[in-house]
Amino acid sequence: MSDNRQTPSGELSYYGLSLLSYLHDSHPLLAADTSFIADRADRAAEAYSDAIRAGSTHAEAEAAASDELYRRLHFSPYNTLVHILWDEFAAEVPEEAARAVALRLLALPVFRDVLAKYDLTDDFAATPEYSQLYTELVGTVQILLEDGLQ
């Protein structure tokens, strides 16, 4: 596999920058994982090249690269928690603080344990298990808020 991780000047590639931007918005705990970002960027570039060599159009090759770049990242526990805080705990957590609170919550072992029970596939939000996860997360947030987390 070629080294498409960084440009000669040491900057991230197009795919690396695209993924980094997405991670900042949807998976902030992964945004500092440079190995993960570089590996995914390499795989996306390879998928693009393979598709072009196989006769795919630019649009088809770009779709193949995007599939590889964002695989298993479409569902965001972070964004789910942010929306739970906005929708269920607006009185307890100000809207402008929800993102920071969600980030703190995701770092707690209790949240990692809840999330580990589910197969968080790209289409997880469309599954029946999503409702169960949502309920568990609401309950966990409620308990933590009652115990003084703010």
Question: Can you annotate each of these PLM segments?
Answer:
Residues 2-150:
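C-terminal alpha-helical interaction appendages
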